[in-house]
């Protein structure tokens, strides 16, 4: 499996898309203060900007391509200026092609400023949320929109709460293993085409595409609808990628890890994810092994590593036998424990 694909990132989203999804996905109600074409305005960055310095006249480093938020400070600053000074300060914003302006805390803008924004084609909104809460709410949404992502072939399943991405060459049986896991009570995230998105520094989230989400292709059978067949308990919309299981064809003479002391990983979008490579051949129960992989991951997560514990016992046994077979050491132990 090639995980070295170049990450994809959205270049922009329209203000119309931003407004619609804040309402539908986050239940954030924005009141429109003017009527302009929101499709023509685009947001290019995920960060938020409060343009206090720009209103004061310092626009050398004005990040106008971001969503502009007017909190109490910006609103009160404008309201305490004279009419002409207020217009001049606001024109420092409107002369740039800013995506939109959002006024928080139900603050009000002078009607003349609303008219200036309308003439400049800048959408104006108002929200009852405080500035801090509003920025917190929309930052996560914008992070989702502008984060890096890529499409990978495989099956993503939630196994005992562990996000397992099953990969391997075409036709090796990834979908069949995923289907068997679903039948045993685990949950499908996506099959065949999996969208993996990087959030923050070290979190990878997997989901399916809108078209094929929760559908599976089983060779010889065709397309099946997992949700319709197994019910809502058999699916979930997204899951964190926590371990990658690569299915490999068994090759006589090829060495595979037999102790678990060798910790392999794979780089996905700049994040290292634990990798388990499983050789397969007819009759081998990969589904049960996949469940054990998930349980073993949970044990390691909570501080217990079976391979390390087994290695420790072997080392302890070797040390004990070395002591028993050393005549000088046996003599010392004899006299130290001589109670006659």
Curated annotation (Swiss-Prot):
GO terms for molecular function: ATP binding; magnesium ion binding; phosphorelay sensor kinase activity; protein serine/threonine kinase activity; protein serine/threonine/tyrosine kinase activity. Its cofactor is Mg(2+). Residues 279-284 are annotated as: Important for the catalytic mechanism of dephosphorylation. Keywords: ATP-binding, Kinase, Magnesium, Metal-binding, Multifunctional enzyme, Nucleotide-binding, Serine/threonine-protein kinase, Transferase. One of its GO terms (biological process) is regulation of carbohydrate metabolic process. Mg(2+) binds at residues 175, 217. The active site is at residues 153, 174, 192, 258. It holds the Pfam family Hpr_kinase_N. Its EC number is 2.7.11.-, 2.7.4.-. It catalyses: [HPr protein]-L-serine + ATP = [HPr protein]-O-phospho-L-serine + ADP + H(+); [HPr protein]-O-phospho-L-serine + phosphate + H(+) = [HPr protein]-L-serine + diphosphate. Residues 216-225 are annotated as: Important for the catalytic mechanism of both phosphorylation and dephosphorylation. It is an enzyme of class 2 (transferase). ATP binds at residues 168-175. Both phosphorylation and phosphorolysis are carried out by the same active site and suggest a common mechanism for both reactions. Catalyzes the ATP- as well as the pyrophosphate-dependent phosphorylation of a specific serine residue in HPr, a phosphocarrier protein of the phosphoenolpyruvate-dependent sugar phosphotransferase system (PTS). HprK/P also catalyzes the pyrophosphate-producing, inorganic phosphate-dependent dephosphorylation (phosphorolysis) of seryl-phosphorylated HPr (P-Ser-HPr). Homohexamer. Belongs to the HPrK/P family. The Walker A ATP-binding motif also binds Pi and PPi. This is HPr kinase/phosphorylase. It comes from Chloroherpeton thalassium (strain ATCC 35110 / GB-78). The lineage of its organism: Bacteria, Pseudomonadati, Chlorobiota, Chlorobiia, Chlorobiales.
């Amino acid at each position: 499996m090639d995980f070295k694909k170049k990450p994809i990132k959205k270049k922009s989203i329209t203000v119309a898309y931003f407004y619609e999804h804040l309402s539908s996905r986050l239940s954030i109600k924005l009141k429109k203060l003017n009527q302009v074409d929101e499709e023509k305005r685009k947001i290019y960055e995920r960060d938020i900007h409060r343009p206090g310095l720009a209103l004061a006249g310092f626009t050398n480093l004005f990040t106008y391509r971001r969503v502009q938020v007017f909190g109490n400070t910006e609103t009160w600053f404008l309201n305490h200026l004279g009419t002409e000074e207020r217009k001049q300060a606001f024109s420092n914003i409107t002369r740039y092609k800013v995506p939109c302006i959002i006024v928080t805390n139900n603050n009000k803008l002078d009607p003349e400023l609303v008219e200036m924004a309308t003439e400049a084609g800048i959408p104006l909104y108002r929200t009852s949320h405080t500035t801090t809460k509003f920025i917190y709410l929309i930052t996560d949404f914008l992070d989702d929109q502008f984060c890096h992502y890529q499409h990978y072939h495989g099956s993503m399943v939630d196994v005992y709460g562990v996000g397992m991405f099953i990969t391997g060459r075409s036709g090796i049986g990834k979908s069949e293993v995923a289907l068997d896991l679903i039948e045993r009570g685990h949950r499908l995230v996506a099959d065949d085409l999996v969208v993996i998105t990087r959030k923050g520094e070290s979190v990878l989230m997997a989901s399916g595409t809108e078209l094929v989400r929760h559908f599976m292709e089983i060779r010889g059978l065709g397309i099946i609808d997992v949700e319709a067949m197994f019910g809502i308990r058999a699916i979930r919309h997204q899951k964190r990628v926590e371990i990658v299981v690569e299915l490999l064809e068994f090759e006589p003479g090829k060495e595979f890890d037999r102790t678990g002391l060798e910790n392999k990983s794979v780089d996905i979008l700049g994040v290292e994810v634990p990798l388990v490579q499983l050789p397969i051949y007819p009759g081998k129960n990969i589904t049960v092994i996949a469940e054990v992989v998930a349980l073993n991951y949970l044990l390691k997560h909570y501080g217990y590593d079976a391979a390390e514990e087994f290695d420790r016992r072997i080392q302890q046994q070797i040390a004990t036998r070395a002591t028993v077979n050393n005549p000088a050491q046996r003599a010392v132990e004899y006299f130290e424990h001589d109670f006659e």
